[in-house]
């Protein structure tokens, strides 16, 4: 049976977004947890709740994303608190979007295994890349220094353990053209008709 709901996951800088961009270019619907999170940040109630949870991360009475980021990536209990608050809200919106689509739909879910959300999907595609390539990618994309990138990576699922999960592992160790070919191969493996 062809899977309908497919998660795309992987650690920071692994190439999830590039892989999902390829799927979009091919014509498939793709939703992103990061985009949904950005939408939630425009919700006044959401931000007020965060302000109450993290009062030390306020600047002029408003939650400061940079302060919050520094706090949660240096304090594992703060990260757990943030994830316990935000992940259910993100996943609720994500599933509502996905359930409205007839046929195959993809979702970029960065912390899929960490949140235990893999059971919500018919199939999982996991991107993997060397740590050095990931560090370089996040430096160019986000301006994170090596220590910040490594700190964030350490809070995520260990890429070496992906074989223990029921997922298709895509090694993102070449250029974008090779990743495109790997995306086509994954679609064939999942028996998804290419658009």
What residue spans do the PLM features occupy?
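ATP-dependent NMP and nucleoside kinases share a basic, alpha-helical "lid"
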Residues: 93-99, 104-140
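ATP-dependent small-molecule kinase phosphotransfer cores
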Residues: 35, 39-102
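P-loop (Walker A) phosphate-binding loop of NTP-binding proteins
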Residues: 11
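Small-molecule kinase domains that catalyze NTP-dependent phosphoryl transfer to phosphate-bearing small molecules
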Residues: 93, 119-120, 140-190, 195
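ATP-binding Walker
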Residues: 14
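Walker A/P-loop
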Residues: 17
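Hydrophobic anchor at the beta1->P-loop junction of P-loop NTPases
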Residues: 8
């Amino acid at each position: 049976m062809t899977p309908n709901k497919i998660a795309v996951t992987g650690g920071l800088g692994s190439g999830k977004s590039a892989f999902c961009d390829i799927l979009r270019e091919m014509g498939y619907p793709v939703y992103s947890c990061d985009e949904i999170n950005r939408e939630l940040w425009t919700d006044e109630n959401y931000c007020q709740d965060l302000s109450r949870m993290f009062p030390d991360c306020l600047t002029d009475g408003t939650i400061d994303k940079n302060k919050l980021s520094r706090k949660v990536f240096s304090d594992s209990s703060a990260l757990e608190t943030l994830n316990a608050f935000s992940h259910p809200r993100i996943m609720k919106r994500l599933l509502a979007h996905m359930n409205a689509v007839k046929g195959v739909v993809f979702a970029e879910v960065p912390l899929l295994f960490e949140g235990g959300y893999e059971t919500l999907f018919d199939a999982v595609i996991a991107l993997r890349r060397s740590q050095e390539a990931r560090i370089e990618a996040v430096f160019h994309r986000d301006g994170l220094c090596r220590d910040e990138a490594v700190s964030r990576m350490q809070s995520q699922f260990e890429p070496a353990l992906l074989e223990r999960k029921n997922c298709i592992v895509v090694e993102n160790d070449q250029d974008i053209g090779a990743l495109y070919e790997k995306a086509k191969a994954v679609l064939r493996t999942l028996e998804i008709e290419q658009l």
